[in-house]
Amino acid sequence: MVSVSYGCASSNAPSSTTPDTSAVSDAPETEEGMLQVRANGEDFVREGFVSKDGWEIGFEHVYVSLANVKAYQADASFDPETDATLEPTQDVLVVDQQTVDLAEGEADADPILMAEVSAPSGRYNALEWTMPKATDGPAAGHVLMLVGTAEKDGQVVNFTLRLDQEMRYVCGDFVGDERKGILEPGSMADLEATFHFDHIFGDGEAPPDDSINTGALGFEPLAAIAQGDTLDVDMAMLEEQLSPEDYARLQDTIAGLGHVGEGHCALQDMT
């Protein structure tokens, strides 16, 4: 199966990322601590933002279905932008399946805690998760469900986007202000699955020729298919109503959502 790495400013590069777990059973026993995994939609989701084409977007709900969330220890750092294979010495299943609302909480809220489990100490330097269709709750039947409003020049669109593009991400080290995943015996550490929704809509604060905008769909193509002040669509309707170019771009930008902080992930489909 071909896997593709998605990053904020890099081209899509082939990468073989199926973890080789043959060495896991041979890993030595170690003392344990508590390992957390959090989900983060960043300020774009919690505070709202302006799209590349000037729409002010605010979210009421951003439901994301996540499953098989696994943390890995590996002797060598895993780079999803190469064709290297992830060879873990330890793996921990942290979340079986869960739907989270990334828009939950105030603007300054912490990333959402999905779960914490007892885990062997060590450095967790890779993270994997799948995004299947939710089996229950308000987003049942969909992978992503975005609910909110968009406004531009006095026009308001109340939108509900139900997206069902299933995905699997394999990611390397978290990249951010703090190191994550270093678990000392008897202590606690965390990892983060990060979602960059500016990849879909672009960023009005970035230059038009910035890579975040040149690859983004924006909101204008979605506003154009709204019925009055309402847009309530699923993927089948989007495929029918958007131009082929815009629909393909939407699919590509959805695929590029998954990160670990600013760190990149390799994408594999689930078929």
Positions of predicted regions on the chain:
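Bacterial N-terminal signal peptides
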Residues: 1-5
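Low-complexity, Ser/Pro/Gly/Ala/Val-rich intrinsically disordered tracts
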Residues: 8, 20-26
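Bacterial lipoprotein signal-peptidase II cleavage site
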Residues: 6-17
